[in-house]
Structures are given as C-alpha cells and as structure tokens.
Amino acid sequence: HVIRVVELEDMSDLIARGQTCLENTEFKELDHSRDKWVKYYLSSEELELLKRLNNDPRISDATDLYEVNVGLVSGENDFFVMNQATVEEFNLQQSVIPIISRSEQLKGVQLTNEDYNNLIELGKKVFFFAPGNEEFDALTDEQKAYIQWGEGKGFNKNYKCRIRPRWYHVSQTWCADAFLIRQAHLYPRMILNEEKALVTDTLHKVRFLEDIDGKQVAAAFLNTYTLALSETLGRSYGGGVLTFEPGEMRKIRIPMQMADQLDLQKIDDWQRQGEIDKVLEYTDSILLRKSLNLTEHEIELLHSIWKKMCDRRMSRKNQKK
C-alpha cells in the first residue's frame, strides 16, 4: 500500500493551498498492518533506510541481548518506598533495601554506590520496606509499629495490598542488571544497576542473557539508529512523553559490532552533563560508520528521523501548556 501525507494547520490552510498540496506530495510505501502512524511523517528515503537497517543481520535484536519486564508493583509506594528520615523515624535500618522509584533519580548510564548515597543525602525516596514474608507476631517491634501505622492510614485496604496473604510483604523476582526508562522525554536510555537496587514499575528491569556484556549494551544503546527506531516503537500521548511497554522494548535493535571499543565512562560523563550530541557523535563513529559502513549522509538521515519525530511529539507537549 502507498499513502500521501499532507500536514495542514486548519481548513483555511487547505483551501489556500488547494489540491496541489496533495499532488506535490510523494507517495510512501507502508505496511499499515504493522507500521505505526508516526512513520507517515518520514520521507520515502528515510523509510527505506530504516527498513534496510531494521533487516540488517549485523544489528542485534534486543531479545538476543536481554530480558525485560516491568518493575516492582508495591500497591502503595507511600508506604513501601521511603526516604532516610522515615527510616530513622521508625528505626527501620535493618528492614529496608535500596530501590529506585523515579527515572529522575538516574542521571547517567550507570547507577553507582556514590549515586545512591547522593540520593539518600538529597532526601529522595530510595528505601524499600521489606520485613520478609513472616507472620506479624514474628516481626520486630519496629516493623510491627510501622505496619500498624500503615494500617492506620488505610494502606492495607488498597487492592494490590489486600489481595496478598500478608499485605506488608511484596514478592520480589530477579534483581535487575539494568533499568530501561519507561517514559522518556528526549530519548530512552539503559542504566546499569551497579547498586543492585530494586526498581518500581515507573521503570523496566533488564536481565542480560548469558555471555552478554551489559556494559557494552548500555554503552551501545545510545546511538542515532537505536534512538530513531525507538521513536517508531514507543507510544506518545498528549504530554509528549514517549512511553514503552516491555513488548516494545523487546523490539529495540542495537548495533553491537565493535561495541567493545566504546568507553562507558566517557558516555556516562557526557550523559550526566546533558551532552547527548557528543555521545552520539562518538558512538555513531564506531557503531554506524566504522562497523556498519554507513555514509555521512545516511547517519545524518537517521539523525533527521530522530529529531523530526522527537520534536513533533515534544511540540504537542508545548501546545498542551
């Protein structure tokens, strides 16, 4: 199937431009059963480049690199997730474990012990109440007091809490090797979980497959092709935020050839400084130009795809204001 797409301000714009605006617009070939509508705003040349790279066997599918799943659902973060002040108030130092509760708490492409300690000092909610799957009578006095405080607030009556055998115990599965941003503003990102913290469902958790170097994956994730592709996979709503469910994150593709040449620390430093252009210039030169032999024009085309689609959804955010 082919389609023409014309963007107009309003009906008066259509009247002023007339039928010629349609006649002068190129046809685009799209698979309407699979392709999302956002691809309609790309040129035929851009679509062809994406299609070619999406079928390039030299680029790795996410499912060959990692598993991804939703973060922990507590049922009541106001009870289970707390800051240092609450830990000290209820004397729960032996009853909490590290957790990341918001994507804003992650600045680079790795969560280090230093990062976590800085979050504690800033008063962020990075402690998770984990008394264990014990009968109430077997808990410590401090744990009992905190649970009773929570019941006084009615937290135990929330749906996710009341359907548990013990409302104050949240089951935990595997510990994440890394996190993926679930709701991205400018672009998605993978963050290595060096602190071995839990994560709430505001982010996704990642477990690397056997023999996969997670540092290489996190470093290679930030390249212009992967960011351009992500704009066609995620869902954007009125606020301009790009949202990914685990299924969409499994469709991500990452050029991993020569990823062992990337300097993770350099990428992390630039990311923390907000210098994504430096990151992409660096990673593209190795992953796209040197490894995949893409031309300067093709890399510029990928950058155009990413910026065009990112700017489009961000403009909707500004219109909402």
Label every PLM stretch briefly.
Residues 38, 46-269:
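Polybasic, glycine- and aromatic-enriched phosphate-binding surface used to engage nucleic acids
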Residues 8, 14-15, 23, 246, ...:
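S-adenosyl-L-methionine
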Residues 3-7, 178, 254, 280-281:
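Generic low-polarity alpha-helical segments
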Residues 1-42:
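Internal, well-ordered domain-core segments that constitute the primary functional module
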Residues 14, 202, 276:
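Short, mixed-charge aromatic SLiMs
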Residues 22, 32-37, 41-80, 142, ...:
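Non-catalytic DNA-recognition/assembly elements of restriction-modification systems
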Residues 2, 100, 310-314:
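Intrinsically disordered, low-complexity sequence elements enriched in Ser/Thr/Gly/Pro
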